[in-house]
Amino acid sequence: MKLSTNVKGLKGRIRVPGDKSISHRSIIFGSLAKGVTTVRDILRGEDVLSTMQVFRDLGVQIEDDGNLVKIHGVGFEGLQAPKNKLDMGNSGTSIRLISGVLAGQDFEAEMFGDDSLSKRPMDRVTIPLRQMGVEIAGRTERDLPPLKMKGSRELQPIHYQLPVASAQVKSALIFAALQAQGESVIIEKEITRNHTEDMIAQFGGQIEVEGKEIRIQGGQEFTAQEVTVPGDISSAAFWLVAGLIVPDSKIVLENVGINETRTGILEVIEAMGGRMTLSDVDPVAKSATITVETSELKGTEIGGEIIPRLIDELPIIALLATQAQGRTVIRDAEELKVKETDRIQVVADALNSMGAAITPTEDGMIIEGKTPLHGAQVNTLGDHRIGMMTAIAALLAQSSQVELERSEAIKTSYPNFFNDLEGLMHG
């Protein structure tokens, strides 16, 4: 598709779609709780719909009237063996978290996904699950999907040090540990997003978190809840950056989730000198209204413990850095290589084709700013975040057309992205 270029004056208010991480987990916890869980403002992107369909295939009744989702929970012991293979689509979250759920079930299941998911290594989940007594195998020594598995009702607890900072791996092990016979201890490499831990408490379960150490007792039961999903800061990130770099812009984002394990991008914007204010802060819902305006930005260094708190925002942060004066260095982000694409290389290639000066490194990138951008042809390679990053970059392109191939990937997390962009352009 042809993207809008050379745009000025983005103005308006946006309510970004529901948080993807919380949407996935609300379906999982609702299915594993006893009673009827209701979920408002759920994200209806393709990844979350994959999770919803998988739990239907596992015997859970889920109603969705387009406004409210009702989940008739069956508890851990009420899941049924699926009649067919379980389709995870493009969703790494689905396959990893659900493998943890299935670890404590005594039936066989096979999980598969699309071409992109089939290239993503699952060994970081399968290795600890095997230690707990799960039979699980994929393709090659990295356990690429499809994954065939048979869980166990006599799951052994685990004491495990995570070799990578990954909320998905941590959450898979937590779901398994909840079904194990005794106490499990999981130690994180760096603190990652904690939605799973928060929701265990919300659904009436017990979990102890002290710094990077997590303790979970097996054999727990959950009680149905009413869940309202805040807006996704990872989706809001595209508008935060657009508002900062497109001339004469002011964008107001309502009901954005500001869970402390996800707000790294706000710290980066402050470090770069961005004009940004938070209002209507709700400490219980962990949400706020965020306003950004066009700003003079300066380069910064991004690395260490902040990386897990902005891992999904790094593609759009790279674009932000191309419009900042001076050098920005991103390091400790090797996890980007095993996302939907190798996001280090793909981000550099896409933005460099538009005139940026980005050098990919083993664990991040070096970005020289400020650089003018121009037209190019960019392929998302099926990665939703590359698609949205390119659409925002195109707004700055001074000459020639920006053509985006495989733009449908954006529906993974933000089905109404282009409608919202249109609204801001006419705001």
From Swiss-Prot:
Active site positions, chain numbering: D312 (proton acceptor)
Pathway this chain belongs to: Metabolic intermediate biosynthesis; chorismate biosynthesis; chorismate from D-erythrose 4-phosphate and phosphoenolpyruvate: step 6/7
GO terms, molecular function: 3-phosphoshikimate 1-carboxyvinyltransferase activity
GO cellular component: cytoplasm
Residues the entry annotates as binding 3-phosphoshikimate: K20, S21, R25, S166, Q168, D312, K339
Keywords: Amino-acid biosynthesis, Aromatic amino acid biosynthesis, Cytoplasm, Transferase
GO term, biological process aspect, one: aromatic amino acid family biosynthetic process
Keyword Transport (UniProt): no
Chain residues that bind phosphoenolpyruvate: K20, G92, R120, Q168, R343, R385
EC number: 2.5.1.19
Domain of life: Bacteria
InterPro entries: Enolpyruvate_Tfrase_dom, Enolpyruvate_Tfrase_sf, EPSP_synthase, EPSP_synthase_CS, RNA3'P_cycl/enolpyr_Trfase_a/b
Subcellular locations according to the entry: Cytoplasm
Catalytic activity: 3-phosphoshikimate + phosphoenolpyruvate = 5-O-(1-carboxyvinyl)-3-phosphoshikimate + phosphate
Oligomer and partners: Monomer.
PANTHER family, per database record: AROM/DEHYDROQUINATE SYNTHASE, PENTAFUNCTIONAL AROM POLYPEPTIDE
The family this protein is said to belong to: Belongs to the EPSP synthase family.
Full protein name: 3-phosphoshikimate 1-carboxyvinyltransferase
Organism: Streptococcus sanguinis (strain SK36)
